[in-house]
Amino acid sequence: MTVMVSRIEYIGQIVRGEATVIWILVALVLVAYLILPNPTYRTNVKVPTVRYLGGWMPDLVDRLFFNTKATSVIYDGYKQYKKKAYKVLKADGDLVVLSTRYAEELRQLPASTLNALEATFTDHVGDYTTILTDSHLHTETIQKRLTPAIGRLIPRIISELDHAYEVEFPKCDGKWVAINPYEVFLRLVARVGARIFIGDTLCRDEQWLKASIDYTKNIFVTIALLRPVPGFLQPLVGRVLPSSRSLNHQLAYIKNEFLGPLIEKRREMESSGDPNYEKPDDFLQWMMDLAKTEQESHPHNLAQRLLGITSMAVVHTSAMSLTHILYDLLVMPQWLQPLRDEIQEVNPDWHSTTQAHLIGLKGMDSFLKESQRFNPPGELSFHRVVKHDLTLSDGLFLPKGTHICMAAGPISRDADVMSDPDTFDAFRFVKENRPTSGFVSTGATNMHFGLGRYACPGRFFAAFVMKAILSRFLADYDFRFGPDQKDRPKNMMIGDKIVPNVSTPIFIRKRTTSKPL
């Protein structure tokens, strides 16, 4: 199997090979920053500013350093001001990081006061990643249709994974074969996502899979490359960035060649009056049924919304989490056999997996949560944009336009919140056994999926898919690093975001020491 070249590795090659261009861009940034009256968004919230270099350098330097030193800045701010609020300086604007003591007060506020979609749009440089934020249709569809349907969708998930394992994994009976775990998991999750989100017609079409996966990768690359760019330069850089330009072409291709015709065909069938026609039972159809306005119902908007939710909220994040988990097991192999024992006890017949079986994997659930605690998707969570001037209960004034968030990473590593926080204890949440101990649970001390009514709605579906994938992989395969890889591959930091190393190969071999599932 050919291992695909990582887009993140490609980013590194660009940076190393274009040093002269980068220095020219840095010079242009400095000149523009000095001559423009308002080069980036600044908030006038009266809270301390936490800097990487202290207060003796211009703001611009701290903003540029944020992309590589965000973790240090955020943890330092939390250490000093965890009961208060503080400000950090990003290349494209200021973030006000609030204490968890505001959590209950803020989580109940409506979107007209604190807007999560606008914050997500900003955080994911939405002007250049084709993200739609003009309605909550996708969130409503997940909450009203997808999550309640998970129980009856599990057989479809297992069926698609069974096919995916056959076509995506190399033959490795009695021999070690190299794979790129991120790439393999990405394709597994993409196949499952396609089965549930667009149904049987397209889900195994290789052109669809390639187009949707490339779209996912280009979103991630665009975000990674644009985050360190000052906001006033993003319109220039974003329009010439190859990954951003590719996104627009890919989006048009997917709309015109796949989803647009599929939507139109379904509408024709529905309006034909054929008594034998049954609506497809998939996410696309649910969105079509729940759309209330002409704009929401437009085929291109439906297609774009579906691509956004599958690409970033399901496929990419799940593949990253699974890669983290594999690396954790490789450097902490003492947890592997207990997980295998649990799988054999709770879910011995993988092909007959039910929702109850996956819920019963308590040890695996705890492992997922502990892996996320050490390798969260980001150090910051609960992103919101303040839509009108807001004064909090203690008098803190947040002007309209302020981008707020909370320090999810430091909170989950705080000794006041978590006992022995620097020790990886795979089953700590089984022993803890609290209402917030589940992988998908959220709370003021557990915000990696967000908090409140706009916490990640797709986390329930993603968790079941990850458990289904892991149940078979851990039971059927042995795995190890290559001979030159001794330690866990270092995570890559992109601002406050954390991603696994996606270019490290591992070696797998079909297990013969126990009965495969």
From Swiss-Prot:
This is Cytochrome P450 monooxygenase penP. GO terms for molecular function: heme binding; iron ion binding; monooxygenase activity; oxidoreductase activity, acting on paired donors, with incorporation or reduction of molecular oxygen. It comes from the Eukaryota. Cytochrome P450 monooxygenase; part of the gene cluster that mediates the biosynthesis of the indole diterpenes penitrems. The geranylgeranyl diphosphate (GGPP) synthase penG catalyzes the first step in penitrem biosynthesis via conversion of farnesyl pyrophosphate and isopentyl pyrophosphate into geranylgeranyl pyrophosphate (GGPP). Condensation of indole-3-glycerol phosphate with GGPP by the prenyl transferase penC then forms 3-geranylgeranylindole (3-GGI). GO terms for cellular component: membrane. The chain crosses the membrane at residues 17-37. One of its GO terms (biological process) is mycotoxin biosynthetic process. Glycans are attached at residue 501. It is found in: Membrane. Heme binds at residue 456. The keyword Glycoprotein applies. It is a single-pass membrane protein. Its EC number is 1.-.-.-. Pathway: Secondary metabolite biosynthesis.
